[in-house]
């Protein structure tokens, strides 16, 4: 069985190259550090803000948002090594100045970090 060949033995050829909207984007993960973001051109010429680094999170406490400084990444369910690298991903547990919190959004897609408080500092 030769992959990519016809029964006659000839090669299959692509009809066309990939279009811009079909190409995958570069994989990015926000990491802990001084706030740094980037704007990308997306479909129909709009701009999308992606987060590259951040040390601030919007934390929801009893229905009200409050900014807090991120101190450390405790755990990430995607990969335990991401926590060691201080990568900020959805549903990662982070240590903030207000206490432990869980990230509820996708920071690299939205350009900010939203989280809910799980455990308060005493």
Where are these regions (language model features)?
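Ribosome-associated RNA-binding proteins
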Residues: 1-122
